[in-house]
Amino acid sequence: MEIAVIGNSEFILGFRLAGITKTYAAESDEKVVEYVHKVLDDGKIGILVLNSSDMAKIPVRLRTTLENSVHPTVITLGEEEGGLSMRERIKRSVGVDLWK
């Protein structure tokens, strides 16, 4: 399983430096949506990282799909804007609560 990161060039820079190769620089809302669809179609990606402000710009139907997705598990970084916590997402994808 691979990790994919979608965001503006500043957001993805740190992930590139950490060695993540599937990074997508999306400078517009349309590009974010395009890359999200691309990642969802790629069966090799297990984790998708998005900036929470980009997640808020995604159309509601696609956002709901991402919030309920187990494969890939979607992690949003930045401001907490509702949705499931990282703990709940990990619990859903792994099947156990790792914090207990």
From Swiss-Prot:
Subcellular location: Cell membrane
Function: Component of the A-type ATP synthase that produces ATP from ADP in the presence of a proton gradient across the membrane.
HAMAP family per the UniProt record, alphabetical: ATP_synth_F_arch
UniProt KW keywords: ATP synthesis, Cell membrane, Hydrogen ion transport, Ion transport, Membrane, Transport
GO function term, MF aspect, one: proton-transporting ATPase activity, rotational mechanism
Organism per entry: Methanospirillum hungatei JF-1 (strain ATCC 27890 / DSM 864 / NBRC 100397 / JF-1)
Gene from which this protein is expressed: atpF
Any Gene Ontology biological process: proton motive force-driven plasma membrane ATP synthesis
GO CC terms in record: plasma membrane
Family stated for the protein in its record: Belongs to the V-ATPase F subunit family.
UniProt KW Metal-binding keyword: no
Main location: membrane
Taxonomic superkingdom: Archaea
Subunit structure: Has multiple subunits with at least A(3), B(3), C, D, E, F, H, I and proteolipid K(x).
Topology of the protein relative to the lipid bilayer: Peripheral membrane protein
Database matches in NCBIfam families: PRK02228.1 (NF002577)
Name recorded for this polypeptide: A-type ATP synthase subunit F
